[in-house]
Structures are given as C-alpha cells and as structure tokens.
Amino acid sequence: MTIVKDLIFRISSLKFAISLIIFIAISSGVGTFIPQGSNSKFYIENFDEAPIFGFLNGEKVLILQLDHIYTSLWFLFALILLCISLAACSFRRQIPSLKASLKWIEYKSEKKFRKLQLNSSYQINEVEDLISKADLFLKKRGWKTYKFKSHISARKGLIGKIGPLVVHIGLIVLLIGSAYGSFTSQSKEQYLLPGESLDLINESTNSKANIKLVDFSIERESDGIPKQFISKLDFTSEDSKFNEVKTAKVNHPIRFKGLTIYQADWAISNIVLEIDNILYQLQLKEIPEIGNQVWGILIELGSETKKNFLLTIDNENGPLKISNTENFSGNNLYINENPLEVNSSKVSLKKIIPSSGLIIKNDPSIPFIYFSFILIIFGTIISLIPTNQLWILVNQESQSLSIGGLSNKNLVGFKKEFFKLSEEIKNF
C-alpha cells in the first residue's frame, strides 16, 4: 500500500507533469523536423548518408518510430501518462482543496482573529442586532454568508477555486482528442483545374457534397516570388439545396460540413498550343530533375522529318521554353505572340492552365480540441479570481467587535475592501 501511495504521489507531482510536457513538446518538435508518414525507402535513402543530428540514420529513425511519432507507442504512452498525472493531481490536490473550501470555518475566539492576514477590533456601544445587520449588509455586497448567533462566516470568489480543476480537465480532453485525431484523421491531396469538380464524402457525419473550382489565381511579389494562392470554390450539397462560393487561401482554410480544405500547392497542368493551325491541349508533368516547380512534356515537331522537343514552363504567365533534345538550345514562346517556326512547324502558345493543389482533411477530433481550449481559457480566467474570506465576531460581555479576513490572491486589493467594510460595520 505504501508503494502505491508513493507512486501516486510521484505521478501527481508538478515536476513529473512538467517533465512529461517538456518531453511531449520536444517530441512534437522533432515530428515537424522529420517528415512523417513516408515509406521506409525514403528514410533509408535520405538519412543514411546525412544522419539527423549527426547520429540518427534511416534505420534508427524507423526503429525509434520517428517516422510516425504522433501514432507511435511511446508517444501515446507519454500522453496517457500525462493524463493519469493530471487526473491524479486533480483527485489528490484540487478536489480535496475544493471540498475544504466549501466547508464553513468558524472563528469563535478573538485570539484566532489575530492570526489572520487582516484583522481589526473595535469597542462598540450597542451589540443588539449587529450580527443580523452585518449579515444583510454583506449579502447586498455580493458575499455568501453563514450566520451564527454571535458570529458570521462570509466568502466571495469561491469560483476561483474551480479554475485549476477546469484547466486540468481541459488538458485531459486536449490530450485524449489529440490521440483520437492521430488515429482517425484522414487527408487527401487533390489538384483541380478551373471548372473541375470533386465529390466530398464525410464518413464521420455521413454527409455528401460537391466542390467545384471556379477560379484559381496567384499573387506574386514585384520580384516574381509567389505571395498568395487563391482558390474560389463552389460548394453544393447532395440535394442541391445548399450552394455557396467560398475562397481558400494559404493559412486561410475553408471549413465545410466537418471537412477542412487547405490551399496547399499549385501546378501548371495543361497548356494549349496551336501547331500548324491545329489546337492541342497538352498535359504537363513536373520535372524535378530540371528545377523546382518546373513542368514540361516531350513532343514531336516537324512537318516532314519529326524531331523530339522538350517543352518546359515554370510560371503561369509564361514563357514556354521549347528546347531541342539534341543540344538543348531553345526559344521562348509567349501567350498570343507571333508563332515560332520549330523544325518547319509553326507553334504558338494560346493558353496556360494552372491547377490548384488542395488538401482535404477530415479530423473528428477538432470538436474535442476546440472544447478543450475553451475549458483551458475559461479555467485560466476564473482561477485569476481571488477567493476572499471574512469573519465577524461580536462579544456581548466585553462589547467588542472583531473582524478578520483572508485572501489567496490580490491581498492589497482585498485590504482596501476589508477596512472599508470594517468601518461601515462598526458604525451600525
């Protein structure tokens, strides 16, 4: 039994909880540094030659489950342990403290008043009905009172005692919600061209809808660097009774029927070329070997002898570079400019069609997360409320009035109120 009590004491200690929080925070930070959810080959290829922190190669990353930290056994165990620590602290400290606060404490001796933080004593001429008058006076001032024959116990701000317990409950809900979300959340990356649509199905709420990309645009800085990606999306419910156009931007996601749509990326998916008076819409693919965010396609050009040419583009405004695969010399082609003659073929660029990269995420844990933050914020705010206690004792034999007070916060503020109340009560 002693071992169990000692274990509960250690688990419920503040030092243990803080140590766990620091460990979870560091682990979460590592999770943002190491790519999560990739296949084993990715970690072996990327981290064997350049180990993380100088010693974590691909094999160690996989053994330590650093490739999926948030669903790893040791991370979940840390979350569970922190939940147990917070619950143990609540039952061992917060709840007994709250119960003790609910009990009315009686001070019947003038000697006990002298030991309080604040105390004052007065000689009075009339003691009759003083207790009743003081009781009514305090109630009008917002104090909760318990009246005895010759003394009064009063308190105000008891809700502040509930604050730490509410914060603990909020943290527990947050941890449970985070663990739940790690296993149940789903995400899908989808590229849409203007005019294309996608059916959305939220399995957790059993709701269906259709999303259509109305327009996609890119805002750029003066030096050409992308500043913002903007997708205008048309949402239509399954029964077509609901229709709304919303705009998604980077760091400004859309929430719709339990789903969250993030603006994540972009691409140049298609170009429209006119080759020898015939229009062609060509689908491009990303070519990382050439550079970051470069898209292209290999085509044959020539009215007589056909040759391979590589078409590449890295900007939604152009130009399109046409390169000879033999020596990679080429020319730039701009939208609606005069056609270029390439190997006896006349080529002109009519349209560049960018696509919007969206991440559609379904996370059933979001309501838990929001609710937990509401609890944490509410608990933090009310725990700032000071709990003040007041005692009044009337000694009929000595015709004396003793008043004492305690406050767990803001003693300076309570001191002003205490002496103001004392002056008014003694003059009854």
From Swiss-Prot:
**BP GO terms, sorted:** cytochrome complex assembly
Name the major location: membrane
Q: Which gene encodes it?
A: ccsB
Task: Tell me what this protein is called.
Answer: Cytochrome c biogenesis protein CcsB
This protein's GO cellular component annotations are: plasma membrane-derived thylakoid membrane
State the annotated membrane topology for this chain.
Answer: Multi-pass membrane protein
What are the record keywords, sorted?
A: Cytochrome c-type biogenesis, Membrane, Thylakoid, Transmembrane, Transmembrane helix
Assembly description: May interact with CcsA.
Native organism taxonomy: Bacteria, Bacillati, Cyanobacteriota, Cyanophyceae, Synechococcales
Residue intervals passing through the bilayer: 14-34, 72-92, 162-182
Give the originating organism.
Prochlorococcus marinus (strain MIT 9301)
Under the heading InterPro entries, the entry gives: Cyt_c_bgen_Ccs1/CcsB/ResB, ResB-like_domain
> Disulphide bridges in this chain?
none
